[in-house]
Regions:
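Catalytic cores of glycan-processing enzymes that make or break glycosidic bonds
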Residues: 54, 71, 78-83, 122-123, ...
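N-terminal accessory beta-strand-rich subdomains and adjacent acidic, glycine-rich linkers
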Residues: 1-102
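Active-site neighborhood of glycoside hydrolase catalytic domains
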Residues: 173-190, 211-291
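Glycine-rich, aromatic-flanked loop segments that form ligand/cofactor-binding clefts
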Residues: 18, 22-44, 86-110, 118, ...
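Glycine- and charge-enriched low-complexity intrinsically disordered segments
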Residues: 111-127
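Short coil-to-beta-strand
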Residues: 114-115, 145-154, 259-266, 270-271
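Aromatic- and glycine-enriched glycan-recognition loops and surfaces
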Residues: 126-212, 244-248, 289-291
């Protein structure tokens, strides 16, 4: 029995919720193969068995180790879907069928079929040390090369001069951007480029106004020191108050300027599974409610 799984609360590139079963002679252009992709970004488990009768079985779904759900009488629970496809002409055809299905039936809205922009991101060039002048210099060089979009990365908000503080305080840092976000966006657009911006909404720094005001919003087990990753904790996204706060702050930023693109980052996995919103016998619902 082969297994691919994640109990980190996320899927990601580390453990991807997909699998391919293929014949030994399968190549990119020849051979038979089955593919399955779990449409879910939380903890998952894929098990594949090949038994003594030469029968293959695949099971793919929510990871059972962290999952519990109290189902009331007459209530329902909708499990996430799995995309399943087959190719008798190799892995390339299998990939194309997945891509076509996702593009035509999973992607939605006006962005479904538009051409994706070529973009430049300031992160590796500046890290947290930037101002409007530095960002515009990058944009000017990128525009000269024909780049379509500039994405402003981490550090534009709160007191965010390193990765130890400021996460959760989604207010423009006007010491770095003197004219505010709107002025910078206008200048970038004047170069013929679009503008994108970075968020990491799930996260909170202990050194932030948000955490000082609402420490109870962070996922942590009472009476224990929390596990930190990249010097940050996670917000309890199953909490409606947290959802409302993030929706309001992110909406205000996106409505404050002509922003075309969001880079939604997530730089750590989830641990310390506990929420004050559920009793002890229902804590296993948090991983799915979080997603």
């Amino acid at each position: 029995i082969q297994e691919s799984s994640s109990t980190r609360g996320t899927s990601s590139h580390h453990q991807n919720p997909s699998a391919i079963l293929c014949t030994p002679d399968c190549t990119e252009t020849n051979g038979s193969c089955f593919g399955a992709a779990f449409l879910y970004s939380g903890s998952f488990q894929t098990k594949i068995e090949y038994d003594q009768m030469r029968q293959a079985r695949m099971v793919m779904g929510l990871h059972p180790d962290l999952f519990r759900w109290e189902l009331q009488p007459n209530a329902t629970f909708d499990t996430p879907e799995v995309l399943f496809t087959y190719s008798d002409s190799g892995l390339e055809t299998l990939s194309h069928r997945f891509q076509k299905t996702i593009r035509e039936h999973v992607c939605r809205g006006k962005y479904q079929k538009i051409e994706r922009p070529v973009l430049i991101n300031n992160w590796e060039a500046t890290y947290f040390d930037f101002n409007e002048e530095k960002i515009l210099k990058i944009a000017e060089e990128a525009a000269r090369l024909g780049v379509d979009m500039l994405v402003l990365d981490d550090g534009w908000f709160g007191k965010r001069d390193d990765d130890c503080s400021g996460l959760g305080d989604w207010f423009v840092n006007e010491q770095k951007l003197k004219g505010g976000l709107g002025t910078l966006v206008q200048k970038v657009k004047a170069l013929g480029m679009r503008f994108g911006i970075w968020f990491e909404p799930e996260m909170v720094s202990e050194d932030s106004d948000l955490y000082r005001t609402h420490p109870e919003w962070a996922i942590q087990i009472p009476g224990r020191k929390p596990m930190r990753g990249r010097y940050q904790l996670l917000l309890d996204l199953s909490n409606p108050d947290v959802q409302d706060y993030l929706y309001e702050r992110i909406s205000d930023i996106l409505n404050s300027a002509d922003i075309s693109y969001v880079k939604w980052d997530m730089n750590r996995s989830i641990s310390d599974w506990y929420t004050a919103l559920l009793p002890a016998n229902r804590q296993g619902e948090l991983p799915h409610r979080y997603v």
